[in-house]
């Protein structure tokens, strides 16, 4: 399954499922958005993750976390670029 936000109705309530594999978009109720590749329901591969406060991460993900090469840009203009492991900048 892949696509843009899969909406599922269960017990008369709607819930949003992450695409299982391939390209897709996942939007959280608090305004965070991920657009990119999924593997087995997790962010995995290249993607863009944005927060309502203006932060944007563009880069690689593995098992739902920032892993690999990527750049985090903050709304004040600060840029953190390099290699990420478990969502932390390491080099």
Feature roles, as predicted:
Residues 1-91:
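Glycine/tyrosine- and acidic-biased, solvent-exposed loop/turn segments at the edges of beta-strands
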């Amino acid at each position: 399954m892949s696509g843009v936000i899969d909406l599922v109705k269960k017990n008369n309530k709607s819930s949003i499922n992450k695409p299982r594999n391939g390209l897709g978009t996942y939007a959280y109720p608090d305004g965070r958005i991920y657009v990119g590749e999924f593997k087995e329901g997790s962010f995995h591969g290249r993607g863009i993750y944005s927060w309502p406060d203006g932060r944007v991460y563009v880069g690689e993900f593995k098992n739902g976390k920032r892993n690999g090469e990527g750049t985090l840009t903050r709304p004040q203009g600060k840029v953190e670029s390099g290699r990420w492991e478990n969502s932390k900048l390491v080099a």
